[in-house]
């Protein structure tokens, strides 16, 4: 997940319009948690950002581990998790996925589970893990 958010940040800053779910994920994180997705979660712990290994550092990192596994299941179903875009609405604090085809709706569901988990675990967020080095995982 570390690389995923890093790539989202890069794409968001350098390309005006980008296909794929990375920008949707970034937007969803920011709407639900109120935190900057890249700065706060792009390099957090052992699992937030691209890839991940080791033991999650706290509740926030466990959310990212769960998200990595959700994406892994979608990859097994041949979903293009890095390029597949999807539509969602954010209404009254709820994320509503708006797709009827298999991969987009499931990708959105993975991201929705992540952001709800991150919101539930805002209390566990520890700045010591914000830019945690991978070699310590």
Curated annotation (Swiss-Prot):
Query: What Gene3D superfamilies does this protein map onto?
Result: Phospholipase A2 domain (1.20.90.10)
Q: What Pfam families does this protein's entry cite?
A: Phospholip_A2_1
The protein's UniProt keywords, in alphabetical order, are: Calcium, Cell membrane, Cytoplasmic vesicle, Disulfide bond, Endosome, Fatty acid metabolism, Golgi apparatus, Hydrolase, Lipid degradation, Lipid metabolism, Membrane, Metal-binding, Phagocytosis, Phospholipid degradation, Phospholipid metabolism, Secreted, Signal
Reaction catalyzed: a 1,2-diacyl-sn-glycero-3-phosphocholine + H2O = a 1-acyl-sn-glycero-3-phosphocholine + a fatty acid + H(+); 1-hexadecanoyl-2-(9Z-octadecenoyl)-sn-glycero-3-phosphocholine + H2O = 1-hexadecanoyl-sn-glycero-3-phosphocholine + (9Z)-octadecenoate + H(+); 1-hexadecanoyl-2-(5Z,8Z,11Z,14Z-eicosatetraenoyl)-sn-glycero-3-phosphocholine + H2O = 1-hexadecanoyl-sn-glycero-3-phosphocholine + (5Z,8Z,11Z,14Z)-eicosatetraenoate + H(+); 1-hexadecanoyl-2-(9Z,12Z-octadecadienoyl)-sn-glycero-3-phosphoethanolamine + H2O = 1-hexadecanoyl-sn-glycero-3-phosphoethanolamine + (9Z,12Z)-octadecadienoate + H(+)
What does the Swiss-Prot or TrEMBL cofactor note state?
Answer: Binds 1 Ca(2+) ion per subunit.
- Locations listed in the record: Secreted; Cell membrane; Cytoplasmic vesicle, Phagosome; Recycling endosome
Organism this protein belongs to: Rattus norvegicus
Would you tell me the protein name for this molecule?
A: Phospholipase A2 group V
Q: Does Iron appear among the keywords?
A: no
Which residues take part in binding Ca(2+)?
47, 49, 51, 68
Enzyme Commission number = 3.1.1.4
| Presence of keyword Membrane | yes
Q: In which pathway does it act?
A: Lipid metabolism; phospholipid metabolism; Lipid metabolism; leukotriene B4 biosynthesis; Lipid metabolism; leukotriene C4 biosynthesis
The residues forming the signal peptide are: 1-20
**Catalytic residues (positions):** 67, 111
């Amino acid at each position: 997940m570390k690389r995923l958010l890093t790539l989202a940040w890069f794409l968001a800053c350098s390309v005006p319009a980008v296909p794929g779910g990375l920008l949707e994920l970034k937007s969803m994180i920011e709407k639900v948690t109120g935190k900057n997705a890249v700065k706060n979660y792009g390099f957090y712990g052992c699992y937030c950002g691209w890839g991940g290994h080791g033991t999650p550092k706290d509740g926030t990192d466990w959310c990212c581990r769960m998200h990595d596994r959700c994406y892994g299941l979608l990859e097994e179903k041949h979903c293009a998790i890095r390029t597949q875009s999807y539509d969602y609405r954010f209404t009254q604090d709820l994320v509503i996925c708006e797709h009827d085809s298999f991969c987009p709706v499931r990708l959105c569901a993975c991201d929705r589970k992540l952001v709800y988990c991150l919101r539930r675990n805002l209390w566990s967020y520890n700045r010591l893990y914000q830019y945690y080095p991978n070699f310590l995982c």
